[in-house]
Amino acid sequence: MKLLGHKIELWAGLLLPDVSISGMSELRFPEEKPLLRGQDTEMESADTFLSAADTDWKEHDIETPYGMLHVVIRGTPKGNRPAILTYHDVGLNHKLCFNTFFNYEDMQEITKHFVVCHVDAPGQQVGASQFPQGYQYPTMEQLAAMLPSVMQHFGFQSIIGIGVGAGAYVLAKFALIFPELVEGMVLVNIDPNGKGWIDWAASKLSGLTSSLPETVLSHLFSQEELMNNTELVQNYRQQISSCVNQSNLQLFWNMYNSRRDLEMSRPGTVPNAKTLRAPVMLVVGDNAPAEDCVVECNSKLDPTNTTFLKMADSGGLPQVTQPGKLTEAFKYFLQGMGYIASLKDRRQSASAGAVPSASMTRLARSRTASLTSASSVDGARPRPCTQSESSDGIGQINHTMEVSC
């Protein structure tokens, strides 16, 4: 596995320390701990708790240059296949953010082909101890720089990242720093922009007039969802208050609201433009508070390897409210990269002539014109072939494929 062993200079003169295989091999890693039902009593009544069948999930606490990271993993590295690595939004943890999505039956059919690694931001996991007074929470850049330690610990050669909100920002930053370690990114509700003084002042004012859970809810859900006070909103209000340490959450929230611009530019728009190299699928609900931010992020990415998925009738948490549609989109995204070229959809098993929905067919075509065979998964995987590179005469793409479903 190739990891960067040299110093990496980030914005504003920030210098990250050496990150090397030899250095990381000297770190101490506690033994893995099975994730057993009943350990998190406050979560047992929630729909977001891991199902009883998921006894093969295991917890790890991993030492990194910027502190300990709590991760939950299922499976082992499979040949040359990347790991699926997730990063949750602020106010959540891997359970609250991803359980509905990863427990969805069709998603489980996909993930059995990969090792899955959920990363919890420092101090955000269920049952986390409160950080001592004066603790300096890692910056967003440092959160990204912690991930190579996770990859080294488990022997991951590369990852396909799935990030939501703040987690999408962290994974995008990771992909900019370590592009050779990333094969693909699914970025939900990403905001590529930093926070200015006006935003900072507004955030401070909001903190004075609203409780922390309410402030976080306004980040996660649209005003319409909050006004309707749906059962989903009520459930997350209770879970954010009871399952996430409020002091630790405040530190993460403050750091996210101090982030800098990702400083990406679409190739050809400025000299030496820097953007994400790997295939990217941007996802946002058409009623999400982050909709405009995701549209702006789309304008900064390479249109030849970017898919923009806007989910109709979806609010701020599409992975929770519409896991089926997102699973189908993710399946075709993987197929476009040359993975799981043949995967049976349980909903189509009753009819041999069933075909994917029109929107998902368009999504598949936008990612690739020819899929590799399933046997190529463990061998050398060819570079994804977009329509603009294919020889089927479909035509050349000069803009990002946008799909609504």
UniProtKB/Swiss-Prot annotation:
The keyword Transferase does not apply. It comes from the Eukaryota. Residues 352-405 are annotated as: Disordered. Residues 361-376 have a biased composition (Low complexity). It is found in: Cytoplasm, Cytosol. GO terms for cellular component: cytosol. Residues 385-405 have a biased composition (Polar residues). Gene3D superfamilies: alpha/beta hydrolase. Disulfide bonds: none annotated. Pfam families: Ndr. Keywords: Cytoplasm. InterPro entries: AB_hydrolase_fold (IPR029058), NDRG (IPR004142). PANTHER family: N-MYC DOWNSTREAM REGULATED. Contributes to the maintenance of intracerebral BDNF levels within the normal range. May enhance growth factor-induced ERK1 and ERK2 phosphorylation. May attenuate growth factor-promoted ELK1 phosphorylation in a microtubule-dependent manner. Belongs to the NDRG family. This is Protein NDRG4. The gene is ndrg4.
